[in-house]
Amino acid sequence: MSEITGIARQKIHPGKLDEFKRLAAECMRVARIKDTGTVQYDFYFNADESECIVYERYRDSAALQEHLQNLGDLMGQVMAICTTTGEVLGEPSPELANG
């Protein structure tokens, strides 16, 4: 299995920056405690903090799937307050690619 890299661009909805930052911090806390195959998981804000780049690296597809399961409802809360686009780099498993 190969390493998987994710790059997400999140445009934060107006008035939701504080909530986004709170949720991002909680996502990072959960990832540090529960994830076993996460290599890197970082949030980078633009100058006016209207957008955030999330740079993620995982040991393999199974590690990314574990991360998504660990975040659970938190991910839904984040997605509700921003518009997200992104890329997955590497060779994700068929389950991850189709899931």
Please name every model-derived segment:
Residues T5-Q10:
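Active-site-flanking beta-strand signature of metal-NTP-handling nucleotidyl enzymes
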Residues V30-V39, R57-G99:
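An amphipathic, aromatic/His-enriched active-site/gating alpha helix that lines ligand/cofactor pockets
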Residues Y44-D48:
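Short beta-strand micro-motifs enriched in acidic
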Residues S50-C52:
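Hydrophobic residues embedded in beta-strands of well-ordered beta-sheets
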Residues K11-K21:
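Short, surface-exposed ligand-recognition loops at beta-strand->loop->(often short) alpha-helix junctions
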